[in-house]
Regions:
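Gram-positive cell-envelope targeting signals
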Residues: 1-62, 79-80, 89, 207-210, ...
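Non-catalytic, conformational "gating/processing" segments within enzyme and secreted inhibitor domains
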Residues: 30-44, 85, 123-289, 309-392
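Acidic/histidine-rich, surface-exposed loop or edge segments in extracytoplasmic proteins
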Residues: 49-60, 93-97, 111-116, 172-181, ...
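His/Glu-rich zincin catalytic helix
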Residues: 58-119, 228-233, 276, 408, ...
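Short Gly/aromatic-enriched secondary-structure transition segments
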Residues: 114-118, 238-247, 296-305
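Short beta-strands and strand-coil junctions in structured, solvent-facing domains, enriched
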Residues: 292-293, 417
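C-terminal soluble interaction/assembly domains
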Residues: 363-365, 371-428
Length: 428
């Protein structure tokens, strides 16, 4: 049996860097980072056996979704706090894949705190399953200029003088489908060019450069990179763009896009609409009921996502978006339980016999959203030291994002929050 799925472009790249603790001779780097139907067979989605369905459900449930959502909300709010009066976007999925690879090389208390943050004791097994599932989101067929793509790639770049543990290498290859290459980090220019070329290729040009030569120190020994790339057009017709500007908030004016939404959500704190991409993922625009400043935590995002959506007609309005965010995540991650990975007590002995600890974790994101689709990119860098009855007439709902709002780009099928953000201005 064949099933139709309706398919903006999102790119996520996570880059993790390792450097030997002081006193070690090995060497990492400081990374800055119409309506087309896709036909998917039931056989491809699952093999039509009860066992396969159970496996899928078990794997989806293997990640504590409450933990994942709470972490995403908390991190987005922390980034917004240090970027007051600016739009922000954070990619939890990008960070999770970077931390997931680190967890494969961690031991003791370091492994425990990473597992707690990731909401699972075996992120690698989940990563392998998820990377296999998302290949069904891909199609070369274009919809208003956008192909449908959701791809993850991983790589480990080790200095020639650093010996990786066999078990770690095997897990990166088997579970993350990662490639492992050796570099001479003393040749900073060539090392950067090699890593940046990989990132440019795997993010289809959205992230052309991740690191610069001054990011690499004499202690640099390892760089782990993850890229997540998503591209798709909107399902159904494009949004209509207004010809004149209207107010956004109290002080700005902008042109809006209008459309019918696919789902409507409401709780005590917010109203929201979902608009599908062709591949079945969705954009969720969330409007606080109070008109003052807000945090995502205020809006009870988990409760909103778990509430039963209404399928009555919903009219939605929002501005086009084009902005980027850069953030250093060390203090934010330490505040929610990951201080161990930055300390001298960090245990990454599963990566190498040389002592290592995380020095800095950075993330840079970019979002471009218009009437035809969406493009978004994120780079996460962890720099380490080598330490149906008849329906009643529909009620028309409205969600007009004409003042500061929150948003998600969401994998409805597997319950993964790829991006979360807060919009406070249209002038960027």
């Amino acid at each position: 049996m064949m099933k139709k799925q309706k398919l903006t472009a999102i790119t996520v790249a996570a880059v993790t860097a390792l450097t030997p603790i002081a006193g070690s001779s090995t060497v990492y780097a400081k990374l800055m980072p119409s309506d087309t139907d896709i036909i998917v067979s039931d056989e491809e989605e699952n093999t039509d056996t009860g066992e396969d369905v159970d496996v899928d459900e078990a794997m989806k449930d293997s990640i504590d979704k409450t933990t994942a959502i709470n972490n995403a909300v908390s991190m987005t709010d922390k980034i917004a706090k240090v970027n007051k009066d600016k739009n922000v976007m954070f990619s939890p999925e990008s960070l999770n894949f970077a931390l997931g690879m680190l967890a494969e090389g961690a031991d003791g208390e370091t492994k425990k705190v990473l597992q707690k943050y990731l909401g699972t004791e075996n992120f690698a097994e989940y990563a392998k399953w998820y990377m296999d599932k998302i290949k069904y989101y891909n199609s070369e067929e274009e919809n208003y200029g956008y192909k449908s793509k959701l791809k993850i790639a991983d790589a480990v770049w080790a200095d020639n003088n650093l010996t990786l543990q066999d078990k770690f290498k095997q897990s990166i290859q088997d579970n993350f489908n990662g490639e492992i290459q050796n570099l001479d980090f003393s040749d900073k220019e060539n090392s950067c060019n090699t890593i940046n070329a990989w990132c440019d290729k795997n993010t289809e040009g959205l992230i052309p450069e991740i690191i610069t030569p001054d990011a690499i120190s004499e202690n640099t020994g390892l760089c782990l990179t993850n890229s997540l790339y998503f591209e798709s057009g909107w399902s159904g017709d494009p949004w209509e763009v207004s010809k004149k500007k209207e107010k956004f908030g109290e002080k700005e004016e902008t042109k809006y896009m209008t459309s019918k939404g696919d789902r409507y959500y409401e709780n005590d704190k917010a109203t929201a609409f979902a608009r599908y991409y062709v591949n079945g993922l969705s954009f969720i625009g969330i409007l606080p009921k109070d008109e003052g400043d807000f945090t995502l935590e205020d809006l009870d995002i988990e409760g909103l996502l778990k509430s039963e959506p209404e399928y009555d007609e919903v009219q939605c309005k929002m501005p086009k978006l084009n902005f980027e965010t850069s953030a250093t995540l060390n203090d934010m991650l330490s505040d929610i339980g990951l201080e161990n990975i930055f300390s001298d007590k960090a245990d990454f002995s599963g990566i190498s016999e040389q002592n290592t600890k995380v020095d800095t974790i950075l993330q840079k994101t970019k979002l471009e959203l218009d009437q035809n689709g969406t493009k978004a990119a994120a780079v996460t860098a962890a720099i380490m030291e080598c330490m149906s009855a008849l329906a009643p007439d529909p009620v028309v709902k409205e969600v007009n994002l004409d003042r500061p709002f929150a948003f998600l780009i969401y994998d409805d099928i597997n319950g993964e929050m790829l991006f979360a953000g807060k919009v406070v201005t249209t002038t960027e």
